[in-house]
UniProtKB/Swiss-Prot annotation:
Keywords: Membrane, Phosphoprotein, Transmembrane, Transmembrane helix, Transport. The chain crosses the membrane at residues 69-89, 101-121, 244-264, 269-289, 297-317, 328-348, 362-382, 396-416, 421-441, 453-473. The modification Phosphoserine is found at residue 207. Putative solute transporter. The gene is Slc35f5. The keyword NADP does not apply. This is Solute carrier family 35 member F5. InterPro entries: EamA_dom. Pfam families: EamA. It comes from Mus musculus (Mouse). Coiled coil: none annotated. Residues 253-317 form the EamA domain.
Length: 524
């Protein structure tokens, strides 16, 4: 009996193996080892898992958007509580130390504390010491577009090259030569059980798919690591953040200075109500300079803002005659601050579309630095013009300013900007309306202020306009007012339906004979 030959080369017809029937651990098919096939299959399964996860992430984007909206609303509610407490503390400070410019300058300069992140936070130091964006950005330049395509594109076009057919030379393989030396005594060839093609088809991927070929050789954890690197690379550098902070430093300072001037002239409740008019300016600016779908202009949003403005007018009319002059000046400062706040949030959201691209603490840190370096000459200007005499506060007032600056400015502004990124610029500005009931309660309890019925009549529509706009943005810019207007217009201007008369059937002709079609169906 002739022993079965040891077959370790290519799968030539007639070759047998000494391994068990299912022991394919070292088998070779058409010049490809089974280990290579198994490794390629495992890699392909890993990449398929990546594609499936990307599809799942794209399908769950609606759920994540709702979570972002809910988190943003909670953050804005917390900011409202902090702002009301900060406003009451500021109002108390102004009774003993009425220096709005000094208070604003001191609070804004405290943003410099965020720059301590360059000492504590290692990624910030890497951006300055090693040029963090250099090598990874060049190495994974095309990968960002690849991951974006995985989540947005629904079909991958197979743009392979034209097929090239090359004959397979089984006898030229080194394994075949080794086989011929070991089993040269065999003279009777066995009947072929597996027939292989003598021609192999070769297709080449285009250069645009080179990244996919590279990723197919990477494990799933490695792909996830590179994806996290891409997110880090997508962040703005320290230089870019500093440039943005330099521009918004002046706008932010003017907005806060206007708010502080208003607090020094009138009650906290009136200031907060008038400051909520920033929703009108935000709606107009966001319609002109939209940053996302949540900033789209709708008729329902316009009516909600008009409702808020109507309430503001009633609140302004509720002021007493004794303090009418100061209330008017405070109202003007409040409206100016509302306008600057709208410019600030709309422009920064247009400049930075996602919150993960901007390091918010770094942004505010540079804002405080530029404020400290560039705006100190304002003390001399206001002192010599007589608008605000420079005077250093006492220890109690200084302690109140420091506490108010750390919590009411440094922390609250960070949370507010984060909440605006999670929701929309309009919701972020209209969130100021929620300070109305809290400030009313605080003024009535702490300062014993009595408000007229006009004040409450105006506070209610301003308060509810925030919830109206939130619902409209939550339901994908739902515009019920426009829908109602269209239905009313269609009801009024509807046309009578054209009724067919018997003579119309004579003028109708079927292009396809229904009788012939039915006969063909019956025949089949």
């Amino acid at each position: 009996m002739v022993p079965p030959r040891l077959h370790r080369g290519a799968g030539r017809p007639g070759g047998l193996s000494s391994l068990p029937p299912f022991g394919l651990g070292s088998a070779r098919f058409a010049g490809i080892a089974f280990e290579d096939l198994r490794e390629a299959l495992a890699t392909r399964l890993q990449m398929v898992y990546v594609f499936i996860m990307n599809r799942v992430n794209s399908q769950s984007s609606g759920f994540s958007q709702r979570r972002r909206m809910a988190l943003g609303i909670v953050i804005l509610l917390l900011v409202d509580v902090i702002w009301v407490a900060s406003s009451e503390l500021t109002s108390y400070v102004f009774t003993q130390y009425n220096k709005p410019f000094f208070s604003t300058f001191a609070k804004t300069s405290m943003f410099v504390l965020y720059l301590l992140g360059f000492i504590i936070w290692k990624p910030w130091r890497q951006q300055c010491t090693r040029g963090f964006r250099g090598k990874p950005a060049a190495f994974f330049a095309d990968a960002e577009g690849y991951f974006a395509a995985c989540t947005t594109d629904t079909s991958m076009s197979s743009s392979l090259s034209e097929p090239l057919y090359v004959p397979v030379k089984f006898h030229d393989l080194p394994s075949e030569k080794l086989e011929s030396t070991n089993i040269g005594t065999e003279k009777t060839p066995k009947k072929s059980r597996v027939r292989f093609s003598n021609i192999m088809e070769i297709r080449q991927l285009p250069s645009s798919h080179a990244l996919e070929a590279k990723l197919s050789r990477m494990s799933y954890p490695t792909v996830k690591d590179q994806e996290s690197i891409l997110k880090t690379v997508g962040k703005l550098t320290a230089t870019q953040v500093a440039k943005i902070s330099f521009f918004f430093c002046f706008v932010w300072f003017l907005a806060n200075l206007s708010y502080q001037e208003a607090l020094s002239d009138t009650q906290v409740a009136i200031v907060n109500i008038l400051s909520s008019t920033s929703g009108l300016f935000t709606l107009i600016l966001a319609a002109v300079f939209p940053s996302n779908s949540g900033d789209r202009f709708t008729l329902s949003k316009l009516l909600a803002v008009i409702l808020s403005i109507g309430g503001v007018v009633l609140v302004n009319l509720s002021g007493s005659e004794k303090s009418a002059g100061r209330d008017t000046i405070g109202s003007i400062w409040s409206l100016a601050g509302a306008m600057f706040y709208a410019v600030y949030i709309v422009m920064i959201k247009r400049k930075v579309d996602r919150e993960d691209k901007l390091d918010i603490p770094m942004f505010f840190g540079f804002v405080g630095l530029f404020n400290l370096l560039l705006l100190w000459p304002g003390f001399f200007l206001l002192h010599y013009t007589g608008f605000e005499d420079f005077e250093f506060p006492n220890k109690v007032v200084l302690l109140c300013i420091i506490i108010n600056g750390l919590i009411g400015t440094v922390l609250s502004e960070f949370l507010w900007l984060w909440g605006c990124f999670l929701t929309s610029s309009l919701i972020g500005t209209l969130a100021l309306s929620l300070t109305i009931p809290l400030s009313i309660i605080a003024d009535m309890c702490m300062q014993k202020v009595q408000f007229s019925w006009l004040f409450f009549a105006g506070a209610i529509p301003v308060f509810f306009s925030f919830f109206i706009v939130t619902l409209l943005c939550h339901y994908n810019n739902w515009d019920p007012v426009m829908v109602g207007v269209r239905r009313v217009f269609a009801f009024i201007c509807r046309k009578h339906r054209i009724q067919r008369v018997p003579e119309d059937s004579e003028q109708c002709e079927s292009l396809i004979s229904m009788h012939s079609v039915s006969q063909e169906d019956g025949a089949t």
